[in-house]
A protein has these predicted regions:
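Glycine- and acidic-residue-biased ligand/ion/polar-headgroup-sensing regions
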Residues: 1-14, 24-27, 44
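Phosphate-/nucleic-acid-contacting segments
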Residues: 107-188
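Polybasic "coupling" helices that flank or enter modular domains
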Residues: 48-49, 64-130
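Short, surface-exposed beta-strand-loop junctions and turns on beta-sheet-rich folds
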Residues: 14-16, 60-62, 164
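Short acidic-glycine loop/turn motifs at beta-strand connectors
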Residues: 13, 48-49, 151
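Cyclic-nucleotide recognition modules
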Residues: 19-79, 83, 87
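Structural motif
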Residues: 5, 50-52, 154
């Protein structure tokens, strides 16, 4: 992607879902598939519309084999996404909904480089692996505390420093990983 946000979501046999990966312009869809092996059954969603470059997968595989530069870039992306996947799995298991929502909103804000974007509560519930009522409650608490404004799918981050204080440690961990891999901090 050159702008926007994509998420990778894992779906269980009972239909429940959880986000297991997120990226903006630093990511590459299907990067794990370039390494070979079985197809990964996760689904990719565009969270925030943007632009992306597109190439048939077979052509990308060919270039991956030929180009050291592309291979290094893809391997860096895979390594980064692997670390983030692990952090998000721990986050979804160990942290309450409100700090997870704060973390997630900050990660989106960093990647779209905007403090305002559109997302439905149903979509947020899918990304957080939570019930819609849980997301409604968490978003209401963040809004009551003056950290966000939320109306009809439009989310505006009003106080990013306050939101960072509410966010679980996973936001800082993922942010530091991003800086280590890509040499540039992301800003909320």
């Amino acid at each position: 992607m050159t702008s926007g946000i994509a998420s990778v979501v894992s779906t269980m046999s009972n239909g429940s879902t959880a986000e297991v990966g997120i990226w903006g312009k630093e990511g590459l869809a299907e990067s794990f598939q370039l390494l070979g092996g079985a197809r990964i059954p996760n689904r990719c969603f565009i969270q925030v519309a943007g632009t992306a470059l597109e190439m048939p997968f077979r052509d990308l595989q060919k270039e991956f084999r030929k180009s050291d530069e592309l291979r290094d870039c893809v391997l860096q992306c895979v390594q980064s996404q692997g670390f983030i996947l692990g952090q998000l799995a721990a986050c979804n298991r160990l942290h309450e909904a409100e700090p997870r929502l704060a973390r997630w909103l900050l990660m989106v804000c960093d990647r779209v480089e905007s403090k305002s974007f559109y997302l439905t509560q149903e979509f947020l519930a899918t990304m957080l692996g939570a019930r819609r009522t849980t997301v409604t409650s968490a978003a209401s608490a963040l809004q009551r505390n003056g950290l966000i404004k939320y109306s009809r799918g439009r989310i505006q981050i009003v106080d990013s420093e306050g939101l960072q204080r509410v966010a679980c440690e996973c936001y800082r961990t993922v942010r530091n990983l991003h800086s280590a891999f890509y040499g540039q901090p992301v800003e909320a």
